[in-house]
Structure formats: structure tokens, C-alpha cells
Amino acid sequence: MAILFALFAMVSFTACSSDDDETPSTEDIKTNIVGMWQSTHISGWDYDDTDEENLIKVDQDIPEADSYRMLFKGDGTCKEYYWDDYKWHLDGTYKYEVSGNKIIFYDSHGDIEGTANVLSIKGDVAIFELTLEEGPQDKHRTTFKRVY
């Protein structure tokens, strides 16, 4: 849950595309999101590894040991996994819904855990973008590859 909190509870994602034809539709997302996705790259802004969690500019690939996976099921549930001790561990289970080009995540009480704008979802690659708590100028993008 710490990873989902760090990624999604930072508030919401905002699309930057100036071409509306590039923004995936609700149906595109619903059709293509089902499956296991692994984070592979981050860009924009992120938090450093200190206790202060300072904002830093990033544009880097994510080593597998630091990546996480999200399993989206067709029934509207999502599971998040992190890598530790040479295996994947369940980190949290959520419900999700797709509205426009957004994926809205709900905790077990039905409260919104986070919202992600899907900038792109084509083939085996998806790009999500979020706005960090510090303000709308602080965007964080995560690229995912479909594992299966």
C-alpha cells in the first residue's frame, strides 16, 4: 500500500497532450487495462529517499528491484505488488473505475485512494500521469509495460 500511496495518493493525474485524438477513450482504457503491468520508467517530479521527501526532477528507468506491478482485473479490482527477497509480494487490493481517461482507485471502505490520468495505452505500454500534492505544476509520469 505504501507504493500506491506514494504513487496515487499524491492527488490526481493530468493529461498534457494538446491533441485530443491522442487521449485514450474510456472504452480504450477499459479494453486494454486488464492484465499485469510493471513500472519501467518515471519522469517529471518525484520525492527523494530522505525523510523530508524533497521534490526532485527525474527522468530514469526503474530497476526491476525498485519497480512495482499492478494487476487490473475485468471485474473492477486491482492488486498492487512490490519486489522483495527475489519475489513479488501483495501490497494492496483496490477497486477501480474508468471515467473518461481517468482511473479512479477506491480503498476497502469505498473512499477514493487516488486518481490517475491515462496519457497513453497502446499495445503493451501505458503512461499514467499524476499531479503531486505540492501543486499542479508538479507532474509525475510513470510508464508501465504489460507483463501478461
Can you describe what each PLM-predicted range is?
Residues V11-A15:
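C-terminal motif of bacterial Sec signal peptides marking the signal peptidase cleavage site
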Residues S18-T93, E97-Y148:
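Lipid interaction determinants
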